[in-house]
Amino acid sequence: YISRTLRDDMQAMLGEQQFSTVSLIADQINKELTDRFKGLELVASGLSPALLENPVQLQSFMEQRPLLNELFNGGVMVLQLDGTAAAETPSSAKRVGTNYLDIDTVGAALRNGKSTVGRPVFGKKLQAPVFGMTVPVRTPQGQVIGALSGVTNLSLPSFLDKIGQNHYGKSGGYVL
């Protein structure tokens, strides 16, 4: 009886410790995602219908926002209502002219006006595993006129690596 009670108590205590640790990691990930959404929303609020219609000015506008490239190691792109990339940073990815409407986050932003985090996919132009975060671009009246999508390249160092590099005890780790 005593050994069973002790074992049950130890299992309960270990379960609580693991739950606490997982909760802390989830909070860290949530904060990182929230910060990235705020960055996208801030830039999206500066995108006007006139700017979206002028590719040269739109590209210049995006290049003047280096913070986005710090938040998204795979770059950021402005998408037209049909899902086609109209501007991007960095421009070396050559995504302008590519249609992304088939990507879940892009469809949610353009069709439903929702900001979402996407599932990992293989990047069309980056040719690497990526996931996107997309926010709608709206007129002052609230009409969706485009989208802004930030991409995290999972084959490069990112905010997820910083979280995953933490240790659990002396020899444990985390798989994200």
Name each region found by the language model.
Residues S115, Q127-P129, I145-A147:
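Short, mixed charged/polar active-site loops
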Residues G75-G83, G173-L176:
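Short hydrophobic alpha-helical segments used for membrane anchoring or interfacial signaling
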Residues V43, L79-P90:
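Amphipathic coiled-coil signal-relay and dimerization helices
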Residues R119, Q127, T134:
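Contiguous mid-protein beta-loop-alpha structural module that forms a pocket-lining wall or clamp
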Residues Y1-P55, L67-G74, K114, P129-M133:
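Juxtamembrane extracytoplasmic/periplasmic/luminal helical "stalk" adjacent to the first N-terminal
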Residues L79, R138-T139:
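Core beta-strand residues in small-molecule sensory/regulatory alpha/beta domains
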Residues E53-F72, S91-S92, N99-D104, A108, ...:
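Solvent-exposed, extracytoplasmic
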